[in-house]
Amino acid sequence: YYDASLSFGRNGFDYGLNHSLNASLGEASPTRFQLGDYTFSQLTANLDATRELNFGMAKPAYLALGAEVRRERFQTRPGDSASYQIGPIEAPSGAQAGPGLQPADAARVSRYVAGLYADLSAELTSSLYASAALRWDRYSDFGSAATGKLSARYAFTPEVAARATVSTSFRAPSLAQSAFSFTVTDRGEGGVLSQVRTLPVSNPI
């Protein structure tokens, strides 16, 4: 049996704020702010194949093979300047519920992931079922990783059974985690400006 699929998904978050102000701008402050935009999209292509294998057991074994290619994209856009601006008045700057995303923190990143996987399962006896799976993934930004899983189920009676699984795993950070950047600029003691930053993993600092 063969199965092929192509799927696309997109998620967008438009971050805005109403009925607030930037106190450091005084009367010039708007009461409505655009704090930033966040967009993630994913395009995935899959090809799977399954067949029966006869090893002389009471029931055939099943072998599944597959390949996957995935493209991921993440983008952020800055908010309007009043949402993070430091005005002439010595008061908290930025929109009061939280400042907007600054232009220096805008991100546009993408990556590609290619994967191969295989799964073999069989009823070894009338009471024992076992399966083994292997997967290999190659990330354009994180390198490659191989994982595996072994599972078994033994039925003592039709009503009572024991199951065991051992596996390894790997999860690369999402693009939203690794590429996110955020800056808060405010006045410290004596009116001195200071910045607190959340930096992406690509930042040399």
Model-predicted segments: where are they?
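Short intrinsically disordered, low-complexity coil segments enriched in acidic
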Residues: 1-9, 31-38, 161, 201-205
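Outer-envelope beta-barrel architecture signal
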Residues: 2-4, 59-63, 126-130, 146, ...
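Transmembrane beta-barrel strands of outer-membrane/channel proteins
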Residues: 4-10, 63-71, 116, 132-136, ...
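Surface-exposed extracellular loop regions of Gram-negative outer-membrane beta-barrel proteins
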Residues: 10-14, 19, 71-76, 80, ...
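Short, solvent-exposed amphipathic alpha-helical segments in soluble enzyme
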Residues: 82-83, 149-151
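Solvent-exposed loop/turn segments connecting transmembrane beta-strands
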Residues: 110, 114, 137-147, 169
